[in-house]
Regions:
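Terminal interaction modules at protein C-ends
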Residues: 1-324, 334-601
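Short loop/turn segments immediately following the C-termini of beta-strands
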Residues: 330
Length: 601
């Protein structure tokens, strides 16, 4: 169980084993925070703690740039359309534009799983030209790719080192199905990555968690399947933040001993929905969130609205001394088991180890969950209808095929964002949009007409993320981000952006050290993804600074291919006089020797 204070536990679970690095990864999430997505590649290169800071620097942390440059191109992230939260404007998000693939559920619900499939590869070169060793890891959670402070679950499954363990073929089938659920064309790179990882999941076996003697994964919503939940049990407990009448009427009409949910969700149930539930509780950990003014006015389902309190989903059953736990993304709702795309992991084992009491009563080292259960007392709900209409409009806009046309203009560059289909007609509601990298460049657009919004910009602030604000006249707001494919982007855009983010020559030396030092972990992960960083390099200003020269010479001897990968960047920076004095000449000498040595081998 992830507690609210463990914001980085899911990110920490992505870190490679010792002597391994990331080879490729694919993920799916319902709600997406782009800052949390920054943390994913950063997890493969940075040390993580629990400190959150930002100094407002115009430059990004060097370690974060290294992580993005090294790993962002290895990741495919599927996300439900309309559920990307609006983050603070940062140019560095440009490196994530091609990583995000918006999807819709084929049966009319939402794409709701929270899954990571990661493949690591040994860093050390094998003997006798053998392939590098690879290992798989699968994370199945209830927490989205966000920094929410909520109670969640995560199951970590590592590939077994022998022939025993559980097969996870349905996880691969899930991602293959998501390729067909994309709202726009999926690139060849993403398709190849998904096919390769899914194929690996067909044969790999994964070590069982402690206390578990059988494990199955259940993917819901890609096709019609019956509920995997047992029809009856001697004892039952359901923990679900969201509930609906049809779950208790159709999905599992059998009696339930205990139900734990959110009060506001229980309040929406109809009369008689809980007649077969013996005990009904709300989950009260005393959490509260101090929302900013705009968040207070945001619609109930705004993707940027922070989640607190209960968010875990657990279906626990006991029968004849055996326990079955179902954990994952599915809530106790009809939609979860009929129209949504969901995933549940079924864990089976002795009730004494895996049962309801073991789950709820805690240990000497952990507090008891049952202490946070309070008897439910109904309170009639009050939801403004305007909020629901804004959420519907958000999803409709996010589904539109929008593209950005990039072209040079008299002042630099311009991007025209346009759609062939009209935006939804919204009465008493204004729509504003702007490129994510240019928060001050807002433009009001007409409802009920195709989008046509032109923005003058610079090369470094061209953005493949288009931000939207919907504002109802009663003050209700919703904010979201839509990934937009760009047409006509100059080939040197990312290099130009990297130069701008690196900044001065001193920072370049620090960046170079990070690139040459694979175990670089000098910076707090949350500091990095939230923009904190020093503007000076460690250890001096000159090209003959000992750490830099020493690393260059070691790399020349041990891994000349790494210098070859850096050469285009150094050449590009040298052309703009962005390197420290004399560094270009030093680099040329070392690079030439490295390449000659590699050829000689």
């Amino acid at each position: 169980m992830l507690q609210p204070t463990n914001r980085l536990t899911l990110i920490d679970a992505m870190r490679p084993p010792v002597a391994f690095g990331l080879e490729s990864a694919m993920a799916v999430t319902f709600t997406l925070d782009l800052r949390a997505l920054l943390a994913a590649p950063a997890a493969f290169a940075l040390a993580g703690h629990d400190n959150l800071a930002s100094d407002g620097s115009q430059h990004e942390p060097i370690e974060l740039l290294h992580a993005l440059r090294s790993h962002a191109g290895k990741i495919t992230v599927f996300s439900q359309v309309g559920e990307i939260a609006l983050p603070p404007s940062r140019r560095v998000f440009a490196f994530l534009e091609r990583a995000v693939v918006p999807v819709v559920a084929p049966r009319g619900g939402v794409v709701h799983p929270k899954v990571w499939v990661l493949r690591y590869e040994a860093v050390d070169k094998p003997i006798d030209s053998q392939p590098r060793e690879q290992r798989l890891r699968v994370l199945i959670a209830s927490r989205n790719l966000t920094f929410d402070t909520s109670w969640d679950t995560v199951v970590r499954l590592d590939e077994a080192r022998d022939s025993t363990g559980a097969l996870l073929e349905p996880v691969g089938d899930l991602f293959e199905g998501l390729l067909d659920a994309a709202v726009s064309d999926v690139s060849v790179d993403h398709r190849q990555r998904v096919h390769s990882l899914s194929a690996a999941l067909q044969t790999a076996k994964f070590a069982l968690p402690v206390g578990v003697d059988h494990l199955e994964t259940h993917v819901l919503g890609l096709s019609r399947k019956p509920s995997p939940l047992p029809a009856s049990a001697e004892r039952s407990l359901i923990i679900s933040p969201f509930v609906s009448d049809d779950f208790f009427q159709r999905v599992r009409p059998a009696p339930i001993d205990e139900l734990v949910s959110r009060a506001e969700s229980l309040d929406h149930l109809g009369p008689g929905a809980l007649d077969k539930v013996a005990k009904v509780y709300t989950f009260d950990d005393g959490s509260a969130v101090d929302l900013a003014t705009e968040a207070e006015r945001s619609s109930p389902h705004d993707p940027g609205r922070p989640l607190v309190g209960l968010h875990a989903k657990v279906f626990a059953f006991e029968d004849r001394g055996r326990a079955r736990l179902f954990v994952g993304s599915a809530n106790a709702t009809g939609a979860a088991f009929n129209s949504n795309v969901e995933i549940l992991v079924e864990l089976t084992g002795p009730a004494a180890v895996l049962g309801i009491d073991k789950l709820c009563n805690g240990t000497m080292d952990e507090p008891s969950l049952r202490d946070l259960f309070n008897t439910y007392r109904p309170d009639p709900p009050t939801d403004p209808p305007e909020a629901a209409s804004l959420d519907s409009a958000r999803c409709a806009i996010a589904r539109l095929p929008i593209e950005g046309i990039v072209e040079e203009s008299g002042t630099g560059w311009a991007v025209t964002y346009q759609s062939r289909k009209p935006l939804p007609f919204l009465d008493s509601t204004e729509i504003h949009c702007w490129p994510l990298a240019s928060a001050g460049n807002r433009r009001r657009v007409a409802t009920g007409e195709p989008l046509e919004a032109r923005f003058e910009t610079s090369l470094e602030t061209i953005s493949g993320f288009l931000a939207f604000e919907l504002a109802h006249e009663d003050g209700t707001l919703t904010f979201f981000v839509v990934p937009v494919p760009l047409v006509g982007v100059p080939e040197h855009r990312e290099r130009f952006l990297l130069r701008a983010l690196v900044g001065n020559a001193e920072r370049f030396l620090r960046y170079l050290l990070a690139l040459l030092n694979e175990d670089s972990g000098q910076m707090d992960l949350l500091d990095a993804v939230n923009g904190a960083g020093e503007d000076t390099a460690d250890g001096g200003n000159g090209p003959l600074n000992l750490p830099v020269l020493e690393k260059l010479l070691k790399t020349m001897r041990r891994d000349p291919a790494k210098l070859a990968g850096l050469h285009p960047l150094v050449t590009d920076l040298a052309a703009d006089d962005a390197l420290p004095p004399g560094f270009a000449e030093l680099w040329t000498m070392i690079y030439d020797v490295a390449i000659e040595g590699a050829v000689a081998r």
